[in-house]
Amino acid sequence: MSQFDTNKLNEIDINKVSLSEVISRPNPNKQVVELNRTSLYWGLLLIFVLAVLFSSYIFN
């Protein structure tokens, strides 16, 4: 067996995976996203500062 044939055996055939198996599997990367008050204020400040900086381009 050549090196190409060995690599071919290790690959997963995507056509053999059914859609129901993909949907039923839980997402291992699912994490809770936290938005506390400090992050909210930093985000609002960032949006306000960017709005002030780009207002000259918008209202020109």
From Swiss-Prot:
GO-annotated cellular components: chloroplast thylakoid membrane; photosystem II reaction center
Compartment(s) of residence: Plastid, Chloroplast thylakoid membrane
GO BP, sorted A to Z: photosynthesis
Highest taxon above the source species: Eukaryota
Keywords: Chloroplast, Membrane, Photosynthesis, Photosystem II, Plastid, Reaction center, Thylakoid, Transmembrane, Transmembrane helix
Recorded topology in the membrane: Single-pass membrane protein
Pfam families hit by this protein: PsbL (PF02419)
Residue ranges crossing the lipid bilayer per the database entry: 39-59
Record text on subunit structure and interactions: PSII is composed of 1 copy each of membrane proteins PsbA, PsbB, PsbC, PsbD, PsbE, PsbF, PsbH, PsbI, PsbJ, PsbK, PsbL, PsbM, PsbT, PsbX, PsbY, PsbZ, Psb30/Ycf12, at least 3 peripheral proteins of the oxygen-evolving complex and a large number of cofactors. It forms dimeric complexes.
Summary of the function given for this chain in its UniProt record: One of the components of the core complex of photosystem II (PSII). PSII is a light-driven water:plastoquinone oxidoreductase that uses light energy to abstract electrons from H(2)O, generating O(2) and a proton gradient subsequently used for ATP formation. It consists of a core antenna complex that captures photons, and an electron transfer chain that converts photonic excitation into a charge separation. This subunit is found at the monomer-monomer interface and is required for correct PSII assembly and/or dimerization.
Family: Belongs to the PsbL family.
NCBIfam families tied to this protein: PRK00753.1
Protein name per the record: Photosystem II reaction center protein L
Organism in which the protein naturally occurs: Oedogonium cardiacum
